[in-house]
């Protein structure tokens, strides 16, 4: 195994605990009656994917929600619906990420996400201690900013280039098997915890902290 120098973390289900049911309830409350068919824990589809891949703006998403629900929807309504996905932020995850950086590892975020979610994540409300998510990472590679979503190889290449890292010296931590498989095809080392599992106690992580 090559020496790890760069670590890329997924956001939902890895850095923060995710609630698909909470997200579904949020959009159902807003009036999207078929939210359960439209939403996913790993890769969005339809207009939700358009938002997370940067193909449409927040305003265009809001207008589509108005059309779907046949009523006036505000940007705040959209924000609150997306925020339903957030369960809680495990403090041990954040502490471990900081320890990895202190050990000299490059640490980045590689996430399928959208501007509504990032409004909360990159605000002082994120960790309960006044720090935005960007406080914890050297750099963030967000699908809506990159213009492409995992598992497309392009977003992995963007991350490797931005981190100036070789695939064999990179560890990718993600709870989505399809994302893990693509990373492996590109020669990236991987760790695949279950959704919301405590990965900080995994031997692969503990070894890096020694």
Question: What is the meaning of each model-derived region?
Answer:
Residues 95, 108, 154:
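Active-site phosphate/pyrophosphate-handling residues
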Residues 103-104, 136:
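Structured helix-beta-strand junction loops
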Residues 10-13, 54, 109, 140, ...:
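Generic structural signal for small/hydrophobic residues in well-ordered secondary structure
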Residues 1-5, 114-115, 120-210:
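Asp-based, Mg2+/Mn2+-dependent phosphohydrolase catalytic module
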Residues 2-91, 95, 102-103, 114:
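N-terminal helical cap/lid subdomain that shapes the substrate entry/recognition surface
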Residues 101-102, 184:
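Anion (oxyanion) recognition and catalysis
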Residues 106-108, 189:
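Proline-centered loop/turn at the N-terminus of a beta-strand
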